[in-house]
């Protein structure tokens, strides 16, 4: 009986940890979803090779995962995203998926500032984990990075 109890208890603690470490999205599905992002964003590698042709309203999303928020040189970011980056926000798949769902709400929560705003008004309601996984796949600097610690 003790063995059964111990096994059930161990599983109760293991399942949530396993779910968290394996809850990343599907990069192939995210690449398809990225079509919604192309109106404003492109993905162009450091050598100038175009991975995804897109708009220039938003910053280039190459190597986004693992990068400090609001830090692409020569891009005019909004004040709140720059403040979040200066406060320690480094994009990982989890934070990026949360941001994509509601950028302004994410910044308000992250900065604990009800007046914080994102210049990105688009909200991706479904597939945020997939898009985050796709962006991680075009972020060579993020290899081995699953989830960055939350800044406090």
Model regions and ranges:
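C-type cytochrome heme c attachment motif
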Residues: 32-43, 59-63, 95-101, 118-121, ...
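Positively charged n-region of N-terminal signal peptides that target proteins for export
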Residues: 1-4
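Short, low-complexity, Pro/Ser/Thr/Gly-rich segments in the mature regions of secreted, periplasmic
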Residues: 138-152
């Amino acid at each position: 009986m003790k063995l059964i109890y111990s096994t059930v208890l161990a599983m109760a603690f293991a399942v949530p940890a396993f779910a968290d470490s394996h809850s990343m999205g599907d990069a192939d599905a995210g690449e398809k979803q990225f079509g919604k992002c192309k109106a404003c964003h492109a993905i162009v590698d450091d050598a100038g090779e175009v991975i995804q042709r897109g708009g220039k309203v938003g910053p280039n999303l190459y190597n986004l995962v693992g990068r400090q928020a609001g830090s692409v040189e020569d891009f005019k970011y909004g004040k709140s995203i720059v403040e979040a980056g200066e406060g320690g926000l480094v994009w990982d798949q989890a934070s990026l998926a949360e941001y994509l769902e509601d950028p302004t709400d994410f910044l308000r929560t992250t900065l604990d500032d009800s007046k914080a705003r994102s210049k990105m008004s688009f909200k991706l309601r479904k597939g945020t984990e997939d898009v985050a996984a796709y962006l991680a796949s075009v972020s060579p600097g993020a290899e081995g990075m699953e989830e960055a610690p939350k800044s406090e």
